[in-house]
């Protein structure tokens, strides 16, 4: 059966969206590579947003325009940027593989089969959200290079919103779990192999989201701490608490809603754990420099986040290995059995 007009239009839009995503990725990658080299148009090294070695607290207004708040050290920030770019590449490969499989799949008698397949794998809306995610991430790195911490906090907030929307779209396809399961059962037989690939991609996206929630917390507090007269220790404490609230809310959403769509979802929890590990070292360096009186509170809060995250992991493991057993009864086959069933219902 030939493709319907709806299939033709949706496939053309989808292909154009993937091409746009490819061009955006090339632009972002070239930008992220160039930002690591001097004399290429970027005034400062983005990863040295807080140069703790240059701080001399015995001199008044040593930093002037930038207060040394809690933030990632240069090596951590470089690794984070490279890691995100690699993950963007794998997401792009996923779209390309799905596109090739849809075009190479044999025609079926089902109406709008290609549209149904595209919707489940990741349609034009998710691809557009992916483009916005990469663009806002590029703006964030550029703002760090120009030492515009307030604008960097704003752009990272936009990035995090776009990335959260992209994650939800990839998991739910903005449908109910029943509808998503129904579409999954009716995708093209040749696309069955992409189910495992999509599960891996979703967990990788959640891993990025879990770690990015930590970066979001300290970036927002970095912007606030450099625009208002707030103690640095208060800003650091607020960063940890913000990370705790976000990790708790996101993990709770998975256990209450999103687990109905994808059963294997451990990426967010491991991303939060990596975020805890990534935040521990800057806190130790920060505490050794400023000798804050909130050291115990910092450690206690990190311990609480770790315990809560491990609790959600245990809960996810239990629900993953737990099987629902239904006791089926034999259907009535005789008139006597039907009479007994009617009497029981009465």
UniProtKB/Swiss-Prot annotation:
Segments traversing the membrane: 13-33, 77-97, 118-140, 148-168, 200-220, 237-257, 264-284, 294-314
Recorded superkingdom: Viruses
Intravirion side: 1-12, 98-117, 169-199, 258-263, 315-346
Main location: virion
Keywords associated with the record: Disulfide bond, Glycoprotein, Host endosome, Host Golgi apparatus, Host membrane, Host nucleus, Membrane, Transmembrane, Transmembrane helix, Viral envelope protein, Virion
Subcellular localization: Virion membrane; Host Golgi apparatus, Host trans-Golgi network; Host endosome membrane; Host nucleus inner membrane
GO cellular component: host cell endosome membrane; host cell Golgi apparatus; host cell nuclear inner membrane; membrane; viral envelope; virion membrane
Membrane topology classification: Multi-pass membrane protein
Virion surface side: 34-76, 141-147, 221-236, 285-293
A Pfam match: Herpes_glycop
Cross-referenced InterPro entries: Herpes_glycop_M
Family: Belongs to the herpesviridae glycoprotein M family.
Self-association and partners: Interacts (via N-terminus) with gN (via N-terminus). The gM-gN heterodimer forms the gCII complex.
UniProt function note: Envelope glycoprotein important for virion assembly and egress. Plays a role in the correct incorporation of gH-gL into virion membrane. Directs the glycoprotein N (gN) to the host trans-Golgi network.
Protein name: Envelope glycoprotein M
Organism field: Human herpesvirus 7 (strain JI)
Gene (UniProt): gM
């Amino acid at each position: 059966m030939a493709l319907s007009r709806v299939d033709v239009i949706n496939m053309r839009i989808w292909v154009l969206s993937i091409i746009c995503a490819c061009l955006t990725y090339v632009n972002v990658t070239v930008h992220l590579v160039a930002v690591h080299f001097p004399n290429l148009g970027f005034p400062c090294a983005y990863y040295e947003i807080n140069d703790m070695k240059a701080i001399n607290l015995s001199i008044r207004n040593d930093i002037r325009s930038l207060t040394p708040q809690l933030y990632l050290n240069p090596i951590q920030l470089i690794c984070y940027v490279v890691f995100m770019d690699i993950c963007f590449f794998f997401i792009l490969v996923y779209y390309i593989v799905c596109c090739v499989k849809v075009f190479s799949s044999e025609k079926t008698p089902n109406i709008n089969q290609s549209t149904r397949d595209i919707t489940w794998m990741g349609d034009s809306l998710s691809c557009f959200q992916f483009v916005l995610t990469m663009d806002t991430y590029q703006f964030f790195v550029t703002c760090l290079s120009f030492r515009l911490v307030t604008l960097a906090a704003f752009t990272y907030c936009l990035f995090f919103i776009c990335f959260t929307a992209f994650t939800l779209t990839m998991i739910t396809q903005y449908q109910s779990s029943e509808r998503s399961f129904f579409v999954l059962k009716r995708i093209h037989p040749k696309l069955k192999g992409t189910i495992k690939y999509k599960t891996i991609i979703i967990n990788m996206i959640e891993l990025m989201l879990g770690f990015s929630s930590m970066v979001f917390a300290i970036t927002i507090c970095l912007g606030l701490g450099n625009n208002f007269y707030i103690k640095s220790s208060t800003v650091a404490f607020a960063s940890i608490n913000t990370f705790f609230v976000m990790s708790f809310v996101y993990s709770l959403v998975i256990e209450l809603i999103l687990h109905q769509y994808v059963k294997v979802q451990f990426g967010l929890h491991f991303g939060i754990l990596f975020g805890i590990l990534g935040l521990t070292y800057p806190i130790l360096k920060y505490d050794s420099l400023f000798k804050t009186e909130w050291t115990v509170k910092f450690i206690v809060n990190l311990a609480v986040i770790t315990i809560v995250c491990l609790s959600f992991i245990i809960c996810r493991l239990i629900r993953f290995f737990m099987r629902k057993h239904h006791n089926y009864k034999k259907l009535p086959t005789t008139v006597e059995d039907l009479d007994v069933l009617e009497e029981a219902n009465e």
